[in-house]
């Protein structure tokens, strides 16, 4: 009997143990990442040919202590390699692990190689050659602390390489994992199986091979035992012949069918080729179509199973489309696949929540470095009076109500950008803004006391409901997560897409960027203030400080201002402001743009203006500013500087976003200024719920 080890993906060890025992293995012992077992030569070949779950079959050769590189060399050389190698066999060494002595795996592999070669030359035998690409023998060495384990990899290449897949195509899951997913799905061979996002067809091909009793190793052309001196070719040929006989019989007797579809025509063609190479092409129908076109291929029965490894996203901006995809799949399953089973394998359990289905079972497994989950569902048969479940129903109802009221108002006002929802319901803590036919969801970061997974699932529900209520495609929904404003976070760069959208606001055309920054380039709550500035600007010299993207300057220019001066510290936003001005035909000397620290510029400027708009940050300590600024502490000093630039009879419109801001009226009076609060006049219906989003004042000489 040989002591052997079968490795597998984390989470599949018990499944592999059961498989090996069915093949005849004895003494099976599960460890993390594999199973130790015992078997004769025939069982070695049986496990290589028939295991659908093992990554490799390893024959341990020995262990040695490694306190120096000489210890490694001598420990490897102590093995009688001349009785392991066939004459003329090539070999390769795979070395993994490091310790204080062996600090480089390539160096460790070289010492092992030298020890094996020297074992031959010292006996005056021809030295074996190294072949890193396709060796006859593959020697594996694992170094764990001071112990090196030396073994012969009888698989050669990993057993997931069945021989049917075109190696040029990337596979999101290995064939061994795909086989495990099929086994855990609850699908019964002989019943229909459908994969609506099949990619290159791995799940369906593995299922078809299992169902037709086709050995996973039948199409492999190279093994790791061809140079092994103890290889028994006669037994191997018997195992191979038996596998061929069973495959022919299984295919001839199988009567059910498999269905695969994908939106990518290229991968569907690859799937067809893979299935043909696997010998089961006639059993699988592949079609080019997306999930939106999915329908039950057997509406009159029998019931079957839908299985898939749907896409998941690593980037925030991919989530709306994925949530929509999962939501659509869930609805389609309930509408068309009553009585069927569904099994999905995913690296994002939260996305599976968008199905709005309750799982009966779930399993965990590793897909490379990713922690994944497989969930199995039974789809209840629908009845005529069944009501479809609504995602985030309270939120959806409120959004629908707001949309009905605000859409009509916005159309009458001539505006395309407005707030649809602003944390109206505490449990749905987001803001939803409309920009033409786009929507932006801003999630306010939940407090640390809220369970992160529940918060993420709630956000996914919000996205699904928003897409449904607004009826927009997923690629026109932008998702952002923001904390309550903290200083300069407001202008943080988020992306590099550089995609601008032209929108209208009354008679102005403006550029917004929905993806690259935390804000979009247009503060919606200042909309009425901008319109008022336009109405006040005719024939006047207008100054816009802390101008951001210059939208107030655009309104002033369109209102007939004699000149506009736009000042901001950011070159990016000044270039944006210039684009906004040009879009509205406002260019030339009458419309100046100045890049400067606004507070420093204000103290040094000696010009006069009739109308000044200033919307400073609540607090700033930017390195590019000469000093820190606090709007509550410093607003009187700010007004003193502004008064110096204000022409007789002129007006300052002063706005800020500090909650609870208190205007120092006495301090202003000492400067000879009066302040009229106009906050309520500048709040539009879409911000009616948030009366403290800003405060706004008109300040004039007494």
Curated annotation (Swiss-Prot):
This is Ribosomal RNA large subunit methyltransferase K/L. It catalyses: guanosine(2445) in 23S rRNA + S-adenosyl-L-methionine = N(2)-methylguanosine(2445) in 23S rRNA + S-adenosyl-L-homocysteine + H(+); guanosine(2069) in 23S rRNA + S-adenosyl-L-methionine = N(2)-methylguanosine(2069) in 23S rRNA + S-adenosyl-L-homocysteine + H(+). It is found in: Cytoplasm. SMART domains: THUMP. The gene is rlmL. Keywords: Cytoplasm, Methyltransferase, RNA-binding, rRNA processing, S-adenosyl-L-methionine, Transferase. It holds the Pfam family THUMP. The keyword S-adenosyl-L-methionine applies. GO terms for cellular component: cytoplasm. Residues 43-154 form the THUMP domain. HAMAP family: 23SrRNA_methyltr_KL. It is an enzyme of class 2 (transferase). One of its GO terms (molecular function) is RNA binding. PANTHER family: RIBOSOMAL RNA LARGE SUBUNIT METHYLTRANSFERASE K/L (PTHR47313), RIBOSOMAL RNA LARGE SUBUNIT METHYLTRANSFERASE K_L (PTHR47313:SF1). Belongs to the methyltransferase superfamily. RlmKL family. Its EC number is 2.1.1.173, 2.1.1.264. NCBIfam families: PRK11783.1. Its main location: cytoplasm. Specifically methylates the guanine in position 2445 (m2G2445) and the guanine in position 2069 (m7G2069) of 23S rRNA.
């Amino acid at each position: 009997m040989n002591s052997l080890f079968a490795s597998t993906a984390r989470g599949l060890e018990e499944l592999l143990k059961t498989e090996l025992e069915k093949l005849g293995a004895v003494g099976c012992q599960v460890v993390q990442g594999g199973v130790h077992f015992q078997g004769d030569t025939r069982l070695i070949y049986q496990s290589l040919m028939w295991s659908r779950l093992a990554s490799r079959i390893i024959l341990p050769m020995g262990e040695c202590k490694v306190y120096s590189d000489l210890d490694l060399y001598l420990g490897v050389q102590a093995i009688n390699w001349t009785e392991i190698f066939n004459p003329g066999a090539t070999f390769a060494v795979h070395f993994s692990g490091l310790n204080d002595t062996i600090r480089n795996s390539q160096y460790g592999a070289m010492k092992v190689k030298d020890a094996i070669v020297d074992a031959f030359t010292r006996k005056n035998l021809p030295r074996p050659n190294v072949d890193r690409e396709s060796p006859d023998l593959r020697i594996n060495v694992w170094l764990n602390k001071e112990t090196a384990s030396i073994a012969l990899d009888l698989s050669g290449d990993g057993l997931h390489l069945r021989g049917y897949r075109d190696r040029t195509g990337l596979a999101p899951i290995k064939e061994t994992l795909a086989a495990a997913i099929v086994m855990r799905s609850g699908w019964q061979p002989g019943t229909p199986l459908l994969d609506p996002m099949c990619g290159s067809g791995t799940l369906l091909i593995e299922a078809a091979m299992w169902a037709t009793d086709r050995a996973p190793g039948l199409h492999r052309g190279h093994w790791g035992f061809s140079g092994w001196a103890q290889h028994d070719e006669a037994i191997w040929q018997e195992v191979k012949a038996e596998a061929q006989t069973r495959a022919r019989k299984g295919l001839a007797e199988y009567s059910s069918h498999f269905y695969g579809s994908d939106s990518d025509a290229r991968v569907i063609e690859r799937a067809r080729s893979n299935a043909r190479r696997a010998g089961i092409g006639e059993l699988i129908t592949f079609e080019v179509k997306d999930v939106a076109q999915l329908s039950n291929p057997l509406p009159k029965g029998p019931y079957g199973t839908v299985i898939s490894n749907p896409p998941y996203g690593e980037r925030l901006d991919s989530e709306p489309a994925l949530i929509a995809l999962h939501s659509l799949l869930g609805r389609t399953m309930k509408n068309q696949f009553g009585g069927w089973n569904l099994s999905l394998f995913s690296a994002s359990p939260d996305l599976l929540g968008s199905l709005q289905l309750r799982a009966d079972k779930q399993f965990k497994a590793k897909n490379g470095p990713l922690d994944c989950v497989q969930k199995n569902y039974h789809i209840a048969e629908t009845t005529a009076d069944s009501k479809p479940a609504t995602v985030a129903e309270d939120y959806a109802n409120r959004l629908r109500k707001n949309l009905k009221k605000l859409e009509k108002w916005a159309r009458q006002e001539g505006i395309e950008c407005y707030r649809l929802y602003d944390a109206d319901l505490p449990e749905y803590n987001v803001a939803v803004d409309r920009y033409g036919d786009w929507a932006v969801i801003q999630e306010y970061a939940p407090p640390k006391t809220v369970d992160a997974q529940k918060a993420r699932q709630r956000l996914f529900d919000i996205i699904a409901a928003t897409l449904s209520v607004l009826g927009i495609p997923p690629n026109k929904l932008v998702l952002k997560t923001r904390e309550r404003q903290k200083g300069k976070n407001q202008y943080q760069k988020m992306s590099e897409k550089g995609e601008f959208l032209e929108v209208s606001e009354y008679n102005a055309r403006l550029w917004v960027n929905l993806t690259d920054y935390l804000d979009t380039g247009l503060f919606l709550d200042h909309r009425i203030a901008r319109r008022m500035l336009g109405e006040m600007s005719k024939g006047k010299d207008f100054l816009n400080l802390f101008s951001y993207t210059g939208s107030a300057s655009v309104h002033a220019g369109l209102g007939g201002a004699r000149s506009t001066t736009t000042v901001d510290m950011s070159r990016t936003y000044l270039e944006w402001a210039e684009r906004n001005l040009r879009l509205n035909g406002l260019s030339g000397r009458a419309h100046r743009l100045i890049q400067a620290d606004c507070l420093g510029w204000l103290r040094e400027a000696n010009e006069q203006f009739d109308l000044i708009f200033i919307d400073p940050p609540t607090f700033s300590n930017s390195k590019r500013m000469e000093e820190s600024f606090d709007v509550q502490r410093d607003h009187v000093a700010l007004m003193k500087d502004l008064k110096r630039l204000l022409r007789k009879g002129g007006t300052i419109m002063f706005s800020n976003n500090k909650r609870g801001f208190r205007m120092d009226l006495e301090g202003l009076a000492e400067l000879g200024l009066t302040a009229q609060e106009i906050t309520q006049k500048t709040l539009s219906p879409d911000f009616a719920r948030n009366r403290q989003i800003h405060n706004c004042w008109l300040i004039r000489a007494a």
